[in-house]
From Swiss-Prot:
It is a peripheral membrane protein. Residues 768-787 have a biased composition (Low complexity). Residues 833-844 have a biased composition (Pro residues). It is found in: Cytoplasm; Golgi apparatus, Golgi stack membrane; Cell membrane. Residues 283-316, 703-724, 767-900 are annotated as: Disordered. The keyword Repeat applies. Residues 424-546 form the Arf-GAP domain. This is Arf-GAP with SH3 domain, ANK repeat and PH domain-containing protein 2. Changing residue 482 to A: Reduces Arf-GAP mediated stimulation of GTP hydrolysis 1000-fold. Residues 259-286 form a coiled coil. Binds PXN, ARF1, ARF5, ARF6, PTK2B and SRC.
Length: 958
């Protein structure tokens, strides 16, 4: 800030200069004087704008107040007139009451009018005079005289300095500076004029300060007293009316009783008269129905079925304008909708849902008919009467067809029906999850409102508070009222109220319970929900510094740990920050980039959490790639759906100038291209279905008693963790959505068979094996049932088993090659087979870190299905798909060891010493490794031998 001079300093310096010009230092303070004037001008300009807005507001209050007074006066006049009418009509008690309220309102109106006038006189007039007087004009007008004096002073001093320097130069000397004392006498006139203008300016500023400060506050004090008088006088008027109001209440009760008695007598008389005229009314009603045959009927007349339900052609439509002209329009009827084209081609056609319309004939014109929609009536005219009848029949037939489809459903929409059934099953299981039987916030029973971005259920009262927080905190949907897509249930299936509150309510104070109950009011709910979700006041905090938070976020995404991710969210980590991943695919990746490039069928909910709770879905890597670019590079349509639902930008280009759509077209990823095209045209449905391993719990209703006795059933409390069965395909052909959906709901469409159908397909979305080579000779055919979880096995204790080396990580990212437009592609190129994968640890839980190193990058290539939700590292394109990582299983009581057993499920060996077999294979038991694993070989194939899990077979009686 430049140096300035205060008023007291200016006065002292000017006095000193006036007494001793040659000894004064005023010449050195002139620049400070100018800085002071400039600063004062800035402040005055700001004050001028604020005072102008204040004046404008006061004026608006005055205008609206006078309008209010006028309306009050009209209301008073109406009360007075109505009371007078009551007095004249033998209702003196009611009339006097209305007149009292008229007088009371008139008194309050007069007081309010006086208050408005006082505000105008006390505040508005002084402000107006100040703005039109001292503060009139624009910025800089007030200091113009000062600026002129400054300019004259500077011109004179520059001229004198130049003359002094030239004089010294003539005498052979060089002068760089001229002291103030040397030119004090020559500059006295200009200096005095400068001081005078500065003094005048400060005087004006002082006056303005008084008027906009002290004087304005004095006026506000006067207005305060006027307000006090208004409220005191109003209170006196209220107190004077109180006794009359109390008496009036008693009188009104008496009058009401008398009127009720009159009403009772009239009702009795009406009933007597009705019973006498009952027969005549029935006959009259029958005649009326005959006369009103052309009126509206709930059941519309049936159309001629010969004309069908679809039609295209031209009709004349009467315009809505003043002229009411007939305009020729192209019309089409199809699938329960009437489409009416406009006269101009660039306008989209109007589309009417016939279920909300009514077709009526026009009695005046035989070739005209009316279509009554919910908001207007369309008048149509056909070429002739026969054409009119055809159009009306088609409209009625199409409406009837749409109505039947709405009530009965369409048998041809198998995929949609499967999605609906799957959604219902998911919602049912979500409601059965631990803690989901009560509201997550207040404990009210049977919550039906879902926060899709947090995966919790709340009651309707708490859901209203969630909506007030905004969608960046909680996105509420109704499980019963809204039509949900499976994508909106991902987090609900994986989090739930119990797991969420274990983190977000970990630090609730026990001595002072703050959590609301079902009977709490909305204020208590709002205070608690705001503290819980916005401030995260009660959440468990594990990390304080930013580096530790980002590291925990990175680990949660790598290990596919949803509760670890929720913990990072509770710690307050920025989900869009660059994560500390030294060996990422591209520099400056975010957690969303990492989640997208390492996603599989079991970890889509990790991506969904990041998509819904990140403030920015368009963060770019060092090479300009967004998460959408990653999806299109790997043909990851499921993640693409989640990002498009979250409104991620599809226009951003990477460093190569390619948008996600450009990449999808170049790599011929048709599904991604179709989704992006839908988003560009605004046709993308946010309630979208996604392919995901839901692992629903279903009852085996159709099993025989023999099957139940014969099988070794897995423990019921472990069914949630059971891995799904799978099968391999010999080619890289993509599977249709209907197949994928049927896989997810196999138990719904196949008489509630056990578990799922095949659940791991060669779909690029989840890392397809794109090798063109056929499967191995021991590839497993599809299984109709799901296998129970594999028991833990310590393979290291077998002396014949050697631990295989770890898999070789790919160092050359396939994505770099995909980023560059290639001249030719050879999908059938053979690849060397890496060493087999390491064995699974003896026991692993879902949320614990995996034993294998998770710091290795997961290449953004079309990869095989990972071994489980926690597994990481790429799989070779030549290797068989592995099932998800099995969960440890409690040992069950087994029968005496037989010699021969039969396989219940398909099983693919994870280790070289294990046996691969298919459902129905007979296995000869050679020995027992432990209680859960036996040794044996396939009957008739002694070369196929190894360890197998007991829970995958059943006994064959000798």
């Amino acid at each position: 800030m430049p140096d300035q001079i205060s008023v007291s300093e200016f006065v002292a310096e000017t006095h000193e200069d006036y007494k001793a010009p040659t000894a004064s230092s005023f010449t050195t303070r002139t620049a400070q004087c100018r800085n002071t004037v400039a600063a004062i001008e800035e402040a005055l300009d700001v004050d001028r704008m604020v005072l102008y807005k204040m004046k404008k507001s006061v004026k608006a209050i005055n205008i609206s107040g006078l309008a209010h007074v006028e309306n009050e006066e009209q209301y008073t006049q109406a009360l007075e007139k109505f009371g007078g009418n009551c007095v004249c009509r033998d209702d003196p008690d009611l009339g006097s009451a209305f007149l009292k309220f008229s007088v009371f309102t008139k008194e309050l109106t007069a007081l309010f009018k006086n208050l408005i006038q006082n505000m105008n006189n006390i505040i508005s007039f002084p402000l107006d005079s100040l703005l039109k007087g001292d503060l009139k004009g624009v910025k800089g007008d007030l200091k113009k005289p000062f600026d002129k004096a400054w300019k004259d002073y500077e011109t004179k001093i520059t001229k004198i300095e130049k003359e002094k320097k030239e004089h010294a130069k003539l005498h052979g000397m060089i002068r760089t500076e001229i002291s103030g004392a040397e030119i004090a006498e020559e500059m006295e006139k200009e200096r005095r004029f400068f001081q005078l203008q500065m003094c005048e300016y400060l005087l004006k500023v002082n006056e303005i300060k008084v008027k906009k400060g002290v004087d304005l506050l004095q006026n506000l004090i006067k207005y305060f007293h006027a307000q006090c008088n208004f409220f005191q006088d109003g209170l006196k008027a209220v107190e004077s009316l109180k006794p009359s109001i109390e008496t009036l209440s008693t009188d009104l009760h008496t009058i009401k009783q008398a009127q009720d008695e009159e009403r009772r007598q009239l009702i009795q008389l009406r009933d007597i008269l009705k019973s006498a005229l009952q027969v005549e009314q029935k006959e009259s009603r029958r005649d009326s129905q005959l006369r009103q045959s052309t009126a509206y009927s709930l059941h519309q007349p049936q159309g001629n079925k010969e004309h069908g339900t679809e039609r295209n052609g031209n009709l004349y439509k009467k315009s809505d304008g003043i002229r009411k002209v007939w305009q020729k329009r192209k019309c089409s009827v199809k699938n329960g909708f009437l489409t009416i084209s406009h006269g101009t081609a660039n306008r989209p056609p109007a589309k009417l849902n016939l279920l909300t319309c009514q077709v009526k004939t026009n009695p005046e014109e035989k070739k005209c008919f009316d279509l009554i929609s919910h908001d207007r009536t369309y008048h149509f005219q056909a070429e002739d009467e026969q054409e009119c009848q055809i159009w009306m029949s088609v409209l009625q037939n199409s409406k009837e067809e749409a109505l039947n489809n709405a009530f009965k459903g369409d048998d041809n929409t198998g995929e949609n029906n499967i999605v609906q059934e799957l959604t219902k099953e998911i919602i049912s299981e979500v409601q059965r999850m631990t803690g989901n039987d009560v509201c997550c916030d207040c404990g009210a029973p049977d919550p039906t409102w879902l926060s899709t971005n947090l995966g919790i259920l709340t009651c309707i009262e708490c859901s209203g508070i969630h909506r007030e927080l905004g969608v960046h905190y909680s996105r509420m949907q109704s499980l019963t009222l809204d039509v949900l897509g499976t994508s909106e249930l991902l987090l609900a299936k994986n989090i739930g109220n119990a797991g969420f509150n274990e983190i977000m309510e970990c630090c609730l104070p026990s001595e002072d319970p703050v959590k609301p109950n079902p009977g709490s009011d909305m204020i208590a709910r709002k205070d608690y929900i705001t503290a819980k979700y916005m401030e995260r006041r009660y959440a468990r905090k594990k990390h304080a510094d930013t580096a530790a938070k980002l590291h925990s976020l990175c680990e949660a995404v790598k290990t596919r740990d949803i509760f670890g991710l929720l913990q990072a969210y509770a710690d307050g980590v920025d989900l869009t920050e660059k994560i500390p991943l030294a060996n990422g695919h591209e520099p400056d990746e975010t957690a969303l980039h990492l989640a997208v490039r390492s996603v599989d069928r079991t970890s889509l909910h990790i991506v969904d959490f990041l998509v819904q709770n990140s403030g920015n879905l368009d963060k770019q890597t060092g090479k300009g790639s967004t998460a959408l670019h990653y999806c299109c590079l790997t043909d990851n349509a499921e993640c693409l759906k989640l990002l498009l639902r979250g409104k991620a930008s599809i226009e951003i280009a990477n460093e190569s100038g390619e948008t996600p759509l450009d990449i999808a077209k170049r790599l011929k990823h048709e599904h991604c291209e179709e989704l992006l095209t839908q988003a560009l045209s605004g046709r993308f449905n946010s309630h979208v279905h996604v392919e995901y391993e839901w692992r629903l719990l279903h009852e085996d209703l159709d099993e025989s008693d023999d099957d139940v006795d014969e099988k070794l059933q897995p423990s019921p409390n472990r069914r949630e963790d059971r891995p799904v069965s799978f099968y391999q395909l010999g080619s890289s052909q993509f599977q249709s959505n209907a197949v994928s959906l049927a896989r997810d709901t196999a138990n719904l469409t196949k008489d509630k068979q056990r578990g799922f159908g095949p659940s791991i397909l060669q779909n690029e979305t989840y890392g397809a094996i794109l090798s063109g080579s056929p499967p191995s000779s021991q590839s497993i055919p599809p299984s109709t049932t799901s296998a129970p979880p594999l028991p833990p096995r310590n393979v290291g204790k077998d002396p014949l088993t050697t631990t295989p080396p770890p898999p070789v990580a790919k160092t050359s990212g396939t994505l770099e090659a995909m980023n560059q437009p290639s001249k030719s592609s050879q999908p059938g190129t053979s690849q060397s087979k890496p060493p087999p994968l390491p064995p699974q640890p003896p026991s692993r839980l879902p949320q614990k870190k995996p034993a294998s190193g998770t710091d290795k990058p997961t290449p953004l290539t079309n990869k095989g299905q990972p071994r489980g939700p926690e597994a990481s590292g790429p799989l070779s394109n030549a290797m068989a798909l592995q099932p998800p990582a099995p969960m440890p299983r409690k040992s069950q009581a087994t029968k005496s060891k037989p010699k021969r057993v039969k396989a219940l499920y398909n099983c693919v060996a994870d280790n070289p010493d294990e046996l691969t077999f298919s459902e129905g294979d007979v296995i000869i038991v050679d020995g027992e490794e432990d209680q859960e694993w036996w040794i044996g070989h396939i009957d008739g194939e002694p070369s196929r031998k190894g360890a197998f899990p007991v829970s995958f077979v059943h006994f064959i009686a000798d």
